A protein has these predicted regions:
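Extended, hydrophobic alpha-helical segments in both membrane/secreted and soluble proteins
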Residues: 1-6, 16, 20, 174
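Phosphopantetheine carrier-protein modules
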Residues: 167, 171-174
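Acidic, mature catalytic/reactive cores of soluble proteins
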Residues: 24
Length: 206
């Protein structure tokens, strides 16, 4: 496939847009991350030679995770933060993952590999707090301010965080969880959104 793509790329006068169209149209690119009993053993993370029988899950890079949180929650629009304040927040976020290499070039690299400090940061950081806030402009503010049934609000939370609607079992579980909050439903929606943003399905690229 790579040889064919290379030939066609040259023949198309190095048209990058056309190359991207070809790549995303391939079966290899469109493979599901769901595995079966037959290809469960195909796991490079376990040291096996990749057979490309399904898409391999990988964690988002720090920049990707930051941008995904912003898009999912409108965290950059909550409150009255200025553009410079938002840039400073992004810089602080990225600084947590910068690893300096002790060599002549003073190289740096960013990592996000699920360490305990990183997991705690995802649970308690300023950005997560803003993502789950109900300040004016935030996603949750818009959701709570608009009319709609409980099931619709749960659907919207799933769509924002995971780009899919909840399964029937998930919907039932979330409704039962919300019922335990009584009249404090707002806290329930905040906790639900927090849980979705901290789920593996949100953090991993499928």
């Amino acid at each position: 496939m790579l040889k064919r793509l290379a030939r066609e790329f040259v023949a198309a006068n190095y048209d990058v847009k056309q190359l991207v169209r070809w790549i995303v149209s391939t079966e290899a690119y469109q493979l599901s991350s769901q595995y079966s009993e037959k290809n469960r053993i195909d796991d490079p993370a376990a040291g096996e030679m990749p057979l490309f029988s399904h898409m391999y899950l990988k964690s988002m890079q720090a920049e990707q995770l930051y941008d995904s949180l912003i898009v999912a929650s409108n965290a950059h629009q909550s409150g009255n933060g200025s553009w410079s304040a938002q840039e400073e927040q992004r810089r602080r976020w990225m600084q947590q993952f910068v690893v300096a290499f002790d060599n002549d070039e003073n190289d740096e690299s960013t990592t996000f590999n699920g360490t305990i400090p990183q997991a705690l940061m995802m649970m308690n950081s300023e950005l997560i707090d803003k993502a789950c806030s109900v300040e004016r402009g935030s996603f949750l503010f818009e959701q709570m301010s608009s009319p709609g049934a409980e099931t619709q609000k749960i659907n919207d939370l799933y769509l924002a965080a995971l780009t899919r609607k909840p399964t029937r079992a998930e919907m039932t579980k979330m409704q039962k969880a919300l019922a335990r909050y009584g009249n404090a439903k707002l806290n329930g929606y905040q906790d639900m959104f927090w849980a979705l943003l901290n789920s593996n399905e949100f953090i991993f690229i499928h």
